[in-house]
């Protein structure tokens, strides 16, 4: 849609719906940071600052290893700016660079890793992740992609 909007602009046309959706998408990482903060406060009376957050999925789209333009990167940056400690697991991406710093992902999605964080945030719905396993061991999940839709026990799952 962005390319279509760009090309239309070159010919003097505007697609206000595309412009509005782009603006909403650009604000989504900050919206998610606020939601994560509210979930932590409401469920655990815990501030975002100092919380341990596992980001599940860095890739731009499911089942690929490309993180360029990934909203998960902006989400991590915003969370860290607000004092949260972030970790990530992505079966396709072992590390990424942000502002000259290299971020190393977790090697495995283990019971210990999931239990050790305050919240798991699903940002990329990879098909080779066992979300039932994550749900059984997480304190709470914030699912931004509805990856947990088939899990019957929703007591610790919050959707965007």
Predicted segments — roles?
Residues 1-160:
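Structural/interface elements that position substrates and couple domains in central-metabolism enzymes
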């Amino acid at each position: 849609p962005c390319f279509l909007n760009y090309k239309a602009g070159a010919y003097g046309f505007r697609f206000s719906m595309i412009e509005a959706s782009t603006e909403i998408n650009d604000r989504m990482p900050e919206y998610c940071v606020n939601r994560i903060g509210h979930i932590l406060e409401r469920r655990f009376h815990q501030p975002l600052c100092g919380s341990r957050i596992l980001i599940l999925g860095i890739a731009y789209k499911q089942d690929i290893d490309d993180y360029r333009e990934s909203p998960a990167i902006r989400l991590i940056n915003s969370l860290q700016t607000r004092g949260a400690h972030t970790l990530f697991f992505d079966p396709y991406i072992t590390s990424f660079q942000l502002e000259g710093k290299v971020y190393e992902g977790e090697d495995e999605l283990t019971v210990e890793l999931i239990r050790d964080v305050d919240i798991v945030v699903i940002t990329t719905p990879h098909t080779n992740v066992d979300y039932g396993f994550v749900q059984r061991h997480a304190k709470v999940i914030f699912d931004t992609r509805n990856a947990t839709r088939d899990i019957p026990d929703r007591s610790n799952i919050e959707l965007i």
